[in-house]
């Protein structure tokens, strides 16, 4: 092999290796920043089609309804713990250390984003509440079987302020 071809071959191999290394690093970075959506049943039992469960320490989003009577607040801090369930009977505990959205309440749909702990609790970094009576994130509506109930505020009387 003459020196010119050897130089071209070395350059081509180095270029292909560099592109492969950059692609690998890019895919690794994207994978670590990926937030997958799970329902409480999928966290407990795994995805229905693949059986895959989220790993401990994985960043995920979980959506469902806040279980009535499950909310526990720490009176000395902003720490709150509540359970999220879906129509299939799965339930996941969520802990959150910040102010909850104004529209957050028990029995309503939410999406919580955070890290799954070793004890199966989601340590949430963000909690999103349903923002009006018609909206529900598509993933949550599908997971809940669209069984959420719209609250009717028009029939409630305002308290007498006199």
From Swiss-Prot:
Compositionally biased residues, Polar residues: 153-162
Chain sites annotated for binding heme: 131, 135
Residue ranges of the TM segments: 9-29
Keyword entries, A-Z: Cell inner membrane, Cell membrane, Cytochrome c-type biogenesis, Heme, Iron, Membrane, Metal-binding, Signal-anchor, Transmembrane, Transmembrane helix
UniProt topological domain (Cytoplasmic) ranges: 1-8
Main location, first listed in the record: membrane
MF term (GO), any: heme binding
Membrane topology: Single-pass type II membrane protein
Periplasmic side: 30-162
InterPro entries linked: CcmE (IPR004329), CcmE-like_sf (IPR036127), NA-bd_OB-fold (IPR012340)
Function summary: Heme chaperone required for the biogenesis of c-type cytochromes. Transiently binds heme delivered by CcmC and transfers the heme to apo-cytochromes in a process facilitated by CcmF and CcmH.
HAMAP family recorded: CcmE (MF_01959)
Protein family membership: Belongs to the CcmE/CycJ family.
Protein name: Cytochrome c-type biogenesis protein CcmE
């Amino acid at each position: 092999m003459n020196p010119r071809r050897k130089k071209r071959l070395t350059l081509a191999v180095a270029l292909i290796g560099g592109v492969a290394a950059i692609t690998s690093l890019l895919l690794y970075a994207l994978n670590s920043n990926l937030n997958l959506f799970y329902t409480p049943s999928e966290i407990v039992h795994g995805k229905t089609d693949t059986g895959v469960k989220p790993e401990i320490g994985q960043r995920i989003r979980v959506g469902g309804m806040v279980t009535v009577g499950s909310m526990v607040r720490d009176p000395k801090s902003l720490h709150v713990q509540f359970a999220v369930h879906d129509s299939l009977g799965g339930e996941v505990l969520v802990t959150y250390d910040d102010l909850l959205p104004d529209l957050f309440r028990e029995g309503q749909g939410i999406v919580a984003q955070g890290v799954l702990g070793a004890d199966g609790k989601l340590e949430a970094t963000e909690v999103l509440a349903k923002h009006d009576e018609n909206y529900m994130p598509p993933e949550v509506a599908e997971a809940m079987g669209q069984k959420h109930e719209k609250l009717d505020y028009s029939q409630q009387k305002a308290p007498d302020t006199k």
